[in-house]
Amino acid sequence: MYRFAPSPTGDMHIGNLRAAIFNYICARQKNMDFILRIEDTDKARNIAGKEEEIKEILNLFSISWQHYYIQSENLKFHRQMALKLVSEKKAFACFCTEEELEAKKELAKKQGKAYRYDGTCEKLADIDVLECEKPFVIRLKKPTHTMKFTDFIKGELSFEPENIDSFVIMRTDKTPTYNFACAVDDMLENVTCIIRGEDHVSNTPKQEHIRASLGYNKAMTYAHLPIILNEEGVKMSKREAHSSVKWLLESGILPSAIANYLIMLGNKTPCEIFTLEEAIKWFDISKVSKAPARFDLKKLLQINREHIKMIKDDELNKILDLNKDLAQLAKFYTQETSTIKELKEKMQAIFNAKDFGEFETEYKILKELLKDIELFENYEDFKNELLNKSNLKGKKFFMPLRIILTGNIHGPELSDLYPYIKNFIHELARI
């Protein structure tokens, strides 16, 4: 069982989407169920509407799920599991205040040591715990042995007990910490493989320790994906516009192109342009590079152009939403545009009212002729017919004709454009 477990705290990051895509692909390859779990336990940071936005984005990428969970609905199970650990003396109540802990952290810092919980409350007698009325958290006792696990990308990783520490699993308000809720949910939902970003590597031994302490002995496999760098080679920030999946989509980049690019990013693929369904046939998580991958917007736009060309005409017409059969004309314009947004602007420039400036007189002459002109198969025949009937020459002929046909003073060769614009010429003459 594979899962994607985002938090509804902001726009989906391309790193999150990459994890979703990889989990989905592997689930399909293994013929296993795929889980979508919304991790909403951080109520202060949750943003209204983001849960639905996550589902909408996954649907756009043709990522479907068989099971859907809301983490906060598992709160009773989180509390039951925490109580079980306390009753078995595997976890304990900690009454240390934030101020006390902060003072100890400062002391460790001055001594040049990494702070570790010193066990102040670990050996409190039961009666002392019962009689103490101070707020408390619950800490899981640190493991007694080295924690090891194998990662499909990073190989074998190990963590010593002192580096895992006796960490908090339940807060003073009786809500679970991220690691505890995540570990318990993965256990309850029978997740068998976790693919996520490498920023979660340090969480893995804690989650393994939680499940082991609860007596869960089913093996879990992992793949921690390397970080994505920006074009300057620095870790991509969530504040950077093109790190947001929503921004990429709104910019007119197709979901299929984004998926293509993210699968290819830092990976060995048999070809450069492919669909998600094609990738399912050959994708191998172990071939993903350990090294950070650098995001290249120009490369993504190049891939997007190819995916626009691959779209079926009726589907592209729906996307353009201009109530015309413009698919072939739009695909022709991919030579100078890279996104659906740019294509729409090109199409609107062609079919909207135009400013002819100094060529207003010539425009009126051409407009009348174009309303009924014979639409020859060959551009040269069309051009010569129009030249002869208009008595216009040079710039005074070609510039207004270009504006009529393209809405711009610059653009593709009219001879190249003609086969795609021909059927619209009578209409353009009446705008």
UniProtKB/Swiss-Prot annotation:
Keywords (A to Z) from UniProt: Aminoacyl-tRNA synthetase, ATP-binding, Cytoplasm, Ligase, Nucleotide-binding, Protein biosynthesis
Enzyme Commission identifier(s): 6.1.1.17
One Gene Ontology term of the biological-process aspect is: glutamyl-tRNA aminoacylation
Motif 'HIGH' region positions after renumbering to this chain: 6-16
Q: Which GO terms describe its cellular component?
A: cytosol
In the UniProt record, does the keyword rRNA-binding occur? no
GO MF annotation list = ATP binding; glutamate-tRNA ligase activity; tRNA binding
**NCBIfam families membership:** gltX_bact
Instruction: Please report the name of this protein according to its UniProt entry.
Output: Glutamate--tRNA ligase 1
Q: Which gene encodes it?
A: gltX1
